[in-house]
Swiss-Prot record:
Official protein name in the record: Myelin protein P0
Region Disordered, annotated ranges: 199-245
Annotated organism of origin: Xenopus laevis
Membrane topology summary: Single-pass type I membrane protein
Disulfide bonds: 49-125
Basic and acidic residues bias spans: 199-208, 224-245
SUPFAM superfamilies: Immunoglobulin
Extracellular-facing ranges: 29-153
Length: 245
C-alpha cells in the first residue's frame, strides 16, 4: 500500500486541474440584428440575423425565431432550424415566413411576406452552436405602416415636376434677358458708330466747303479791289479835266 501522505498531494493536484478545466471561461456566442425595421402593408421585409461563435460551426447548430406582438406579453415560436432543416411553426406567419439563412456563413435571416398592420412586434433571434451555447439572443422590432407608396410617389413626382418647371422658366427668363441686353447693346453700338461716321462726314464736308469757298472769297476781294481802283482812276481823270478847264 502507498502511504497516505503520497496520495494526498496527487489528489489535490488532480482536483486543481479538474477545477481549472471546469472553471476556464469560454467565449459566449454573439448574435446581431437590427434594432428597428420598417415595412409597408402588403410588401415583404427581411429580418437579418448574424452571429459569431468561437467554435467551428457544428452540425448541431440550431436557430430559433420568436415573435412577441406589441402590447402583449406572450411570445410565440415561429421558425426553427436544426440539422440542416428549417420548419415554420403554425400561427399567423405560417404561410408568410421564409427561411433564407445559411448557418455556415453565420447567417440566420428570415423574410416575412405580405406584411399586415397586425404584424407589429418584436422578433427575437436565438442561436446555439454546441458546445458554444452560452450567449444572449438579439431582438428586432418590426413597424408596419399603411401602404402609401403610390400617393407618396405621386406627390414626389409633382414636386420634382414643379421644381423642373421652375428651373426651366428661370433659365428661359435669364436667356431672354441676356438676349435683349445683347441686342440693345449692339443697337447702341451701331448708333454710336453711325453718329461717329456722321460727325466725320460732316467734318469732311465742312473742310471741303471751306476749301472751295476760299478761292471764291479771294476772287471776290480781287474784283472789289479792281472796281475800287477803276473808280479811283476814273475819279482822277475827271479831276484832271476839271483842272484843265
Amino acid at each position: 500500500m502507498e502511504p497516505s501522505g503520497l496520495r494526498t498531494p496527487c489528489s489535490l493536484l488532480a482536483l486543481v486541474l479538474l477545477s481549472a478545466l471546469v472553471l476556464t471561461p469560454t467565449l459566449a456566442i454573439e448574435v446581431y440584428t437590427d434594432r428597428e425595421v420598417y415595412g409597408t402593408a402588403g410588401s415583404r421585409v427581411t429580418l437579418s440575423c448574424s452571429f459569431w461563435s468561437s467554435e467551428w460551426i457544428s452540425d448541431d447548430i440550431s436557430v430559433t425565431w420568436h415573435y412577441q406582438p406589441d402590447h402583449s406579453r406572450e411570445m410565440y415560436s415561429i421558425v426553427h432550424f436544426a440539422k440542416g432543416l428549417s420548419s415554420i411553426d403554425a400561427g399567423i406567419f405560417k404561410d408568410r415566413i421564409e427561411w433564407v439563412g445559411s448557418p455556415k456563413w453565420k447567417d440566420a435571416s428570415i423574410v416575412v411576406h405580405n406584411l399586415e398592420l397586425t404584424d407589429n412586434g418584436t422578433f427575437t433571434c436565438d442561436v446555439k452552436n454546441p458546445p458554444d451555447v452560452v450567449g444572449k439572443s438579439s431582438y428586432v422590432h418590426l413597424q408596419v405602416q399603411e401602404k402609401g407608396p403610390a400617393r407618396a410617389g405621386l406627390i414626389l413626382g409633382i414636386i420634382i415636376a414643379v421644381a423642373l418647371a421652375l428651373v426651366i422658366v428661370v433659365t428661359i427668363l435669364i436667356l431672354l434677358i441676356r438676349y435683349c441686353w445683347l441686342r440693345r447693346k449692339a443697337r447702341v453700338q451701331r448708333e454710336l458708330s453711325a453718329l461717329e461716321r456722321g460727325k466725320l462726314h460732316k467734318a469732311k464736308d465742312s473742310s471741303k466747303r471751306s476749301s472751295r469757298q476760299t478761292p471764291i472769297l479771294y476772287a471776290m476781294l480781287d474784283q472789289t479791289r479792281g472796281k475800287s481802283s477803276e473808280k479811283k482812276a476814273k475819279g482822277g481823270i475827271g479831276d484832271s479835266r476839271k483842272d484843265r478847264k
